[in-house]
A protein has these predicted regions:
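Exported/periplasmic cell-wall-interacting domains
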Residues: 21, 26-31, 53-58, 141-149, ...
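Sec-exported extracytoplasmic/periplasmic mature domains
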Residues: 88-95, 112-120, 135-139, 166, ...
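Extracellular mucin-like PTS domains
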Residues: 42-66
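Secretory targeting and sorting signals
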Residues: 1-25
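A structural motif detector for short, solvent-exposed N-terminal "entry" segments of globular domains
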Residues: 140-180
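Short acidic, glycine/serine/threonine-rich helix-capping segments at coil-helix boundaries
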Residues: 74-83, 88-109, 113-133
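Extracytoplasmic/secreted envelope proteins and their assembly/folding machinery
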Residues: 83-87, 108, 112, 131, ...
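Intrinsically disordered, low-complexity Ser/Thr-rich linker and spacer segments
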Residues: 62-77, 128-151
Length: 267
């Protein structure tokens, strides 16, 4: 009887191991081409017993919540008046921006990402609402804190991407994902959906790749033909056939920080 129970338990463990994570359910996207295809010993001495009342102690207050990142130095909106100070504040908050004092596309895209995270109008301009929010902003909380030291998190609701390296937030990018609508292009029809779930970077192409549905720059594929890639147009709302568009200003260096096998969480 004991032997039978032991074999039954062993069989159950084996079944659980064989049916665990690591496979995708449902139809494969391998043949689908998008537009973006396109974490001391010693002696003892007896001493007289004395009673001393315990000293009162006060527990230190908890540190402010910063999403697991170091707290930023306090600034005022007036401190962010110059383009370079504005860019430096965005960079300190891990938005992907070039700190050069130029209000270029890199700065605009970083501002859009900040506006998306904070529920502000997505203008890409340093309006008073933006500088007021930047002055007191903190790093966001992780979506998947146990997802691995190096990982990509994609927030479909807010249309932003987070890159973590060595357990710390490294970059925040604005993205544009699948519209969720039906499309037909040159006889190919489908639903423009960016799949939710847990994936990994499977393969990549360096430089431009031209597909039936458009062009992709430095695509990194994580689900069949669905990729993270650079594109000249990254609207502030979903606009792709399913891929995750990132700004060209980020797409040049982003792949070097995301090796093949990196976990990708789409939520």
């Amino acid at each position: 009887m004991k032997r039978s129970a032991r074999w039954t338990a062993l069989s159950l463990v084996t079944m659980l191991l064989l049916s665990g994570c690591g496979s995708f359910l449902g139809a494969s996207n391998e043949n689908y081409v998008s537009d973006e295809e396109a974490a001391a010993g010693g002696s003892t001495t007896t001493l007289p017993v004395t009673t001393t009342p315990p000293s009162p102690t006060t527990a230190p207050p908890p540190p402010p919540a910063t999403g697991g990142q170091p707290a930023l130095a306090a600034v005022t909106p007036a401190d962010l008046a110059s383009p370079q100070a504005l860019e430096q504040r965005l960079a300190d908050l891990h938005f992907d921006v070039t700190v050069d004092g130029k209000m270029d596309d890199s700065t605009k895209q970083a501002l859009i990402a900040f506006q998306k995270l904070n529920g502000l109008p997505r203008t890409g301009q340093p309006t008073p609402d933006v500088t007021n929010a930047l002055a007191t902003a903190k790093a966001p909380d992780a979506l998947k804190p146990d997802g691995g030291a190096t990982r990509v998190e994609i927030d479909l609701g807010r249309q932003v991407l987070f890159l973590y390296t060595n357990g710390s937030l490294a970059k925040i990018l604005p993205v544009s994902t699948g519209t969720g609508k039906r499309y037909c292009d040159e006889g190919k029809c489908g639903i423009a959906t960016t799949p939710r779930g847990s994936f990994r970077i499977e393969r990549r192409i360096t430089g431009w790749r031209t597909s039936d549905l458009g062009r992709l720059y430095n695509p990194m594929y994580f689900k069949g033909g669905i990729a993270i890639h650079g594109f000249p147009s990254v609207p502030t709302s979903p606009a792709s056939h399913g891929c995750v568009r990132i700004p060209m200003s980020s797409a040049k260096t982003f792949p070097s920080q995301v090796p093949d096998g990196t976990p990708v969480f789409v939520v």
